[in-house]
Curated annotation (Swiss-Prot):
Lineage of origin: Bacteria, Pseudomonadati, Pseudomonadota, Gammaproteobacteria, Legionellales
One Gene Ontology CC term in the entry: cytosolic large ribosomal subunit
Keyword flag Ribonucleoprotein: yes
PROSITE patterns for the chain: RIBOSOMAL_L1
UniProt KW Nuclease keyword: no
Chain's gene name: rplA
Species this protein is from: Legionella pneumophila subsp. pneumophila (strain Philadelphia 1 / ATCC 33152 / DSM 7513)
Assembly and binders: Part of the 50S ribosomal subunit.
Family indicated by similarity: Belongs to the universal ribosomal protein uL1 family.
Protein name: Large ribosomal subunit protein uL1
Gene Ontology biological process terms in this record: regulation of translation; translation
Function: Binds directly to 23S rRNA. The L1 stalk is quite mobile in the ribosome, and is involved in E site tRNA release. Protein L1 is also a translational repressor protein, it controls the translation of the L11 operon by binding to its mRNA.
Keywords: Repressor, Ribonucleoprotein, Ribosomal protein, RNA-binding, rRNA-binding, Translation regulation, tRNA-binding
A molecular-function term among this protein's GO annotations: rRNA binding
PANTHER family, per the entry: 54S RIBOSOMAL PROTEIN L1, MITOCHONDRIAL, LARGE RIBOSOMAL SUBUNIT PROTEIN UL1M
Amino acid sequence: MSKLTKKQKKIAEVIKPNQLYTVADAVAILKQFASKKFRESLDISINLGVDPRKSDQVVRSSTNLPKGTGKTVRVAVFAQGDNAAKATAAGADIVGFEDLADKIKAGEMNFDVVIATPDAMRIVGQLGQILGPRGLMPNPKVGTVTTNVEAAVNDAKSGQVRYRTDKNGIIHCTVGKADFAPEDVLENVVALINDLKKAKPASSKGQYLKKISLSTTMGPGLPIDISSIPV
């Protein structure tokens, strides 16, 4: 059996088995173990009471986090004419049409979010094998296929997170950085859960929010007391 590292020993001393934490307490503990070399993200995992094998129980949506993610987001927009001008004015990093598709096919992927107007989907659809596996394919359900490109760019830049249940019925997303104030993280978590409740499939029965855990990029995951979240 391998020996525990100094960090692992400290984690074992601080984190109590089978204990549930408030968001504030979890953030305070995770801050202790966060890297000093880079800003670690605070990530949340929420186990939902859905059957992801059923198409009508797949939860896919987006949330505008009131306190943002702490990350600089690069946005690419497929649009032309007035919509292209609006996207550029809103702060999109890359705007194009067929030329943007050619860049992506050539391997230029310097962006985190892709937005497209409906008329651009005939072009974007050809990029499914490139964008899809990276979670970048525009989708109307999360607001990335839209005629209102200005609002979509603003949302993406200001802290919108997109999520979809995985094969185990769990959604994963970022709710801030390890150096965020606990109250800011809580505000983001509340916004996320409220949106998840609105997105609950009608066919989902029983307990919907089953388990929640909070972790940093390189740190442990802490189970959260759902009843302590004011939603």
